[in-house]
Amino acid sequence: MAINAQEISALIKKQIENFQPNFDVTETGVVTYIGDGIARACGLDNAMSGELLEFDNGTFGMAQNLESSDIGIIILGDFNSIREGDTVKRTGKIMEVPVGQSLIGRVVNPLGQPVDGLGEIETTATRPVEAAAPGVMQRQSVSEPLQTGIKAIDALVPIGRGQRELVIGDRQTGKTSIAIDAIINQKGQDMICIYVAIGQKESTVRSQVEVLRKYGALDYTIVVTASASQPSPLLYIAPYAGVAMAEEFMYNGKHALIVYDDLSKQAVAYRELSLLLRRPPGREAYPGDVFYLHSRLLERSAKLSDELGGGSITALPFIETQAGDISAYIATNVISITDGQIFLQENLFNSGIRPAIDAGSSVSRVGGSAQIKAMKKVAGTLRLDLASYRELEAFTQFGSDLDSATQAKLNRGRRTVEVLKQGLHKPLAVEKQVLILYALTHGFLDSVPVDDILTFQDDMFDYIDSHDADIFETIRTTKDLPEEAVLDKAIQTFKDQSQFS
């Protein structure tokens, strides 16, 4: 058999031309230190800040400190099986979390992995956890109301869609209850809710999930949990993961409400990471960029311009104070970033005034422009009335005789405090809030005993529902009050027929 050199040469050339080199080039480094959710590695000279890195066991980390000799990495998961000397490689990616409709009704960790035992989440869409906030021209002013269903908030410190309203107070003063009630009240309001639980007990998170399920709120809610037993890197990224999920809805023209419960624990987790990474400590041992930690998170909440779809993210960040000190470092930082604060006081809570909102220290800087006309009319003087009542109440403790005008103010003040009380998980529709506040400010409650105010309120709602339902319908559709004569007649007719006449 003759061997044709030209044929062999052509065959070899063809194979060389068709040769596909099957190898990957990856930049790897070596772990030099591991512990407390932190790793240090050398050899990754080209790693970028915030880049995802992969360890031998499949766990991911995020590059934080880029130094000349090595890099500091926070580990996003179990670090117990990582050893000194293990290899770590670059991925060339930044951290992203799954987003989209399929997350609604689920409980996930900050990596977007389900922890509710209901199977995998079917979604291919992702968003980066760190993203730039909308610019000045991409926003519009807050103009639509977000009804929390809580009389004291919707009347005194109204919240608008796209606002950041801080909820601040000591532990066990009802902060989480306000958030859960606000979420429950979003039923039928075309709002997606995201509840981010940071550093809470897993049993507490479970009970909150069950409350949401009981009231049907889980149908439009995503729960992101980084419990107290999780490594601090997960507590640090949990709020960013939550807002990334919310941004998917906002940029698609929808409205989202996100609750951060609470950012004090995130700041503590970030302080822990920073100290372990040997960053220089500042005031209260927090790192110098702790303000930026929260500002870049809360600035991602916005009301987008109509050109971008008009979607919004409304944020309710929580801060826990010690002994009512709202001048602490983290508290003042977040107060300066947000558009107002709701201050909860322990002494009000313990005296049975719940929600324990201190009207004097609470403020909403932009929510007033989002309040509906009807509420503006009935709640206009409410804050002033409460402030003068508190002042007079302190004065009466000296036991001096009071003239009839002062006594009338005190009586009205006591009834105002009573009207603003509300049961747990009983949010009220805005038209019902308007009606009871109208009855209060127009003197219909002045002759009702203080202890019977809430009974009077419930009975009045039932009566108006069955006899004058068009009053509620008018407020709901026009956002304004019906004719005063119609309201006066309906309330007076109920009062004459009731036990309070």
Swiss-Prot record:
Pfam families: ATP-synt_ab, ATP-synt_ab_C, ATP-synt_ab_N. GO terms for molecular function: ADP binding; ATP binding; proton-transporting ATP synthase activity, rotational mechanism. Coiled coil: none annotated. It is found in: Cell membrane. It is a peripheral membrane protein. It is an enzyme of class 7 (translocase). It catalyses: ATP + H2O + 4 H(+)(in) = ADP + phosphate + 5 H(+)(out). Its EC number is 7.1.2.2. Keywords: ATP synthesis, ATP-binding, Cell membrane, CF(1), Hydrogen ion transport, Ion transport, Membrane, Nucleotide-binding, Translocase, Transport. ATP binds at G169, D170, R171, Q172, T173, G174, K175, T176. One of its GO terms (cellular component) is proton-transporting ATP synthase complex. The record marks S362 as: Required for activity. Its main location: membrane. F-type ATPases have 2 components, CF(1) - the catalytic core - and CF(0) - the membrane proton channel. CF(1) has five subunits: alpha(3), beta(3), gamma(1), delta(1), epsilon(1). CF(0) has three main subunits: a(1), b(2) and c(9-12). The alpha and beta chains form an alternating ring which encloses part of the gamma chain. CF(1) is attached to CF(0) by a central stalk formed by the gamma and epsilon chains, while a peripheral stalk is formed by the delta and b chains. Produces ATP from ADP in the presence of a proton gradient across the membrane. The alpha chain is a regulatory subunit. Belongs to the ATPase alpha/beta chains family. This is ATP synthase subunit alpha. It comes from Streptococcus mutans serotype c (strain ATCC 700610 / UA159). The gene is atpA.
